Amino acid sequence: MKKKIEKHLIGLTGEYFVAGMMSLKGWVASLTLKNYPSVDIFGLDPETEKTINIQVKTTKNVKSYQVGVMRSQRPEINDRITCPFVFVYIDKDNNIEYYIISRNQLIDLILTTDDEYYNRPRKEPLKDYPIAISLKDLAEFKDEWLNLWK
């Protein structure tokens, strides 16, 4: 399978699994059309009538996620991260793990972990790079579905 198609299918897999989990929890989940920027799922809690936008990032056998922000864009991070994220990890045996993080939690995590990465001693200074979050940094958010509504 071509790499681009495989990556697209892995992304769709994560979105469908997240929508399914939301449905099991009694929430309404609707996948967006792919031309809707920075939102993969619209969510509704029928009990509270609260609505949310959700961004889903999925990897298979890769233990880090790019979050759509370059290092040079850090000053605009509050504008670029607009909603909660669900990070979906699919292992080599197709087991699924979910890491759910609110918008504010994600912004704090990005700033902390990126500072740690950026300030490491290096021979050459870093050029601009896409900011990524590692699976180990997301551990405390595993299966924390209520973070969607924070």
For each feature predicted by the language model, list its residue ranges.
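Mixed-charge (Asp/Glu-Lys/Arg
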Residues: 1-37, 42-150
